[in-house]
Amino acid sequence: MRAVIQKTVGAKVDVVSEAGTETCGKIDGGFVVLLGVTHSDTEKDARYIADKIAHLRVFEDEAGKLNLSLKDVGGAVLLVSQFTLYADAASGRRPSFSQAAPAEQAQRLYLRTAELLRGHGIHVETGRFRTHMQVSLCNDGPVTILLDSFMTRISPKMKVVPD
């Protein structure tokens, strides 16, 4: 599971259709998280990503150090599904998305990640799965962090959330 985490002072996601544009998620401050799911992802990956998002210390304390977490500052998450995080553009000019999980699996783990974040006491707004969306945000910092739960399987230094 891959997550691109962007610290924001405000963000929204709109669903665009023939009927028009509808805002389906909006936050005042916290993180915009673009979340991609691959074939081998499980509940364990969702737990790892949710735990990292909740506890990443990238907000400034009184001394100006990045020492506070999303939970510490009462921030929210705008969670947006993003299968293109598993694009492979190594050959040719059109990316392959074969590493992205099938829609049913991806949606289940996307919703589970949102549920796990809520379990941490974090307010979560979401995009709408399998729709055309437009994400607007005002980056803060900017701070952008890439997480990949696969790294926990190949690096002994990475901490894994216990079962």
UniProtKB/Swiss-Prot annotation:
Keywords (alphabetical) are: Cytoplasm, Hydrolase, RNA-binding, tRNA-binding
Q: Fetch the InterPro entries from UniProt.
A: Daa-tRNA_deacyls_DTD (IPR003732), DTD-like_sf (IPR023509)
Major enzyme class: hydrolase
Give any single GO term for biological process: D-amino acid catabolic process
Alphabetically, the GO molecular function entries are: D-tyrosyl-tRNA(Tyr) deacylase activity; Gly-tRNA(Ala) deacylase activity; Ser(Gly)-tRNA(Ala) hydrolase activity; tRNA binding
Name any GO cellular component annotation.
cytoplasm
Q: Which domain of life is it from?
A: Bacteria
Under catalytic activity, the entry for this protein gives: glycyl-tRNA(Ala) + H2O = tRNA(Ala) + glycine + H(+); a D-aminoacyl-tRNA + H2O = a tRNA + a D-alpha-amino acid + H(+)
EC number in record: 3.1.1.96
Motif Gly-cisPro motif, important for rejection of L-amino acids, chain ranges: 141-142
- Location(s) in or outside the cell: Cytoplasm
Q: Which family does it belong to?
A: Belongs to the DTD family.
Family annotation (NCBIfam families): D-aminoacyl-tRNA deacylase
Subunit structure, as described in the record: Homodimer.
Function summary: An aminoacyl-tRNA editing enzyme that deacylates mischarged D-aminoacyl-tRNAs. Also deacylates mischarged glycyl-tRNA(Ala), protecting cells against glycine mischarging by AlaRS. Acts via tRNA-based rather than protein-based catalysis; rejects L-amino acids rather than detecting D-amino acids in the active site. By recycling D-aminoacyl-tRNA to D-amino acids and free tRNA molecules, this enzyme counteracts the toxicity associated with the formation of D-aminoacyl-tRNA entities in vivo and helps enforce protein L-homochirality.
Question: What remark about domains does the record contain?
Answer: A Gly-cisPro motif from one monomer fits into the active site of the other monomer to allow specific chiral rejection of L-amino acids.
Protein name as it appears in the record? D-aminoacyl-tRNA deacylase
* Gene behind the chain: dtd
